[in-house]
A protein has these predicted regions:
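Long, basic/Gly/Ser/Thr-rich N-terminal segments
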Residues: 1-145
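Pre-Walker A adenine-sensing motif
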Residues: 16-20, 152-164
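Glycine-rich phosphate-binding P-loop
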Residues: 168-179
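N-terminal pre-Walker A segment at the start of P-loop NTPase domains
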Residues: 139-159
Length: 180
C-alpha cells in the first residue's frame, strides 16, 4: 500500500525551501512553529506517512543555522496553566522543551515572556532561566490591540517591548502550548 505522504521528500523539500527563504531575506528568517514539534500524533494520524517528529527532524537538518525562541504568556505562569496532554504546567514545559532541544543539539537562544505582568511567579521563572544561562525578554500587553494600530506601532506599543537579540539566520519561535 502506498502512503499518502512521503516523509523523506517532505524533510528534503521543506529544509531546502527554508534555506532559500533565508537567502531571500538577507540571511534572517523568522518562523513560527505552531503545533507540536515532538510527538505530533494527530498529524501522523491524519497524514499517513507523516512521522510524529517530522518537524523536529526537519529542524535538525538546519540546526547549525537555527536558533529557538520559546514564548510563554505571563498569565500562563501566574495561573499555573496545565498542558492537558502532559499534565505539567506551561512553565515546567518550557524547561522541558529547553532540555529536549539542547539534548538534540539545537540552540535555544532565549525565552520571551509575553503579556508581561510583574508577579512573583513570573520573576522567579525568569530568575530560574537566567541562572542557567537562558536569556529572557519581556513583551508587554498593548492596550487597544489589535484595533488601535497607531498605538500598537508607537513607542508605547511594540516600541515598549524588549528587543529579542538573535544570532543565527533561522529564528524558530515556538511555545509550550496553545494561547501562550
Amino acid at each position: 500500500m502506498k502512503k499518502g505522504f512521503d516523509n523523506a521528500k517532505y524533510l528534503q523539500m521543506q529544509s531546502q525551501h527554508i534555506r532559500e527563504r533565508i537567502a531571500q531575506f538577507d540571511n534572517k528568517l523568522y518562523l513560527e512553529f505552531g503545533g507540536k514539534l515532538f510527538d505530533d500524533y494527530h498529524a501522523s494520524r491524519v497524514l499517513p506517512g507523516f512521522e510524529p517528529d517530522s518537524k523536529l527532524q526537519m529542524l535538525l537538518q538546519l540546526k547549525e543555522q537555527a536558533e529557538i525562541v520559546i514564548v510563554i504568556s505571563a498569565q500562563d505562569i501566574i495561573s499555573s496553566k496545565v498542558r492537558g496532554d502532559y499534565g505539567i504546567t506551561y512553565d515546567l514545559d518550557v524547561l522541558r522543551l529547553i532540555d529536549a532541544f539542547q539534548g538534540m543539539g539545537l540552540f535555544v537562544g532565549s525565552v520571551c515572556v509575553t503579556m508581561y505582568t510583574a508577579a512573583p511567579e513570573v520573576e522567579a521563572f525568569e530568575h530560574k532561566l537566567n541562572s542557567v544561562g537562558v536569556r529572557t525578554f519581556r513583551h508587554y500587553k498593548i492596550p487597544g490591540y489589535p484595533n488601535d494600530v497607531a498605538h500598537i506601532v508607537s513607542d508605547d506599543g511594540y516600541g515598549k517591548n524588549e528587543y529579542i537579540e538573535t544570532t543565527r539566520p533561522l529564528v524558530v519561535v515556538t511555545a509550550p502550548g496553545p494561547g501562550s
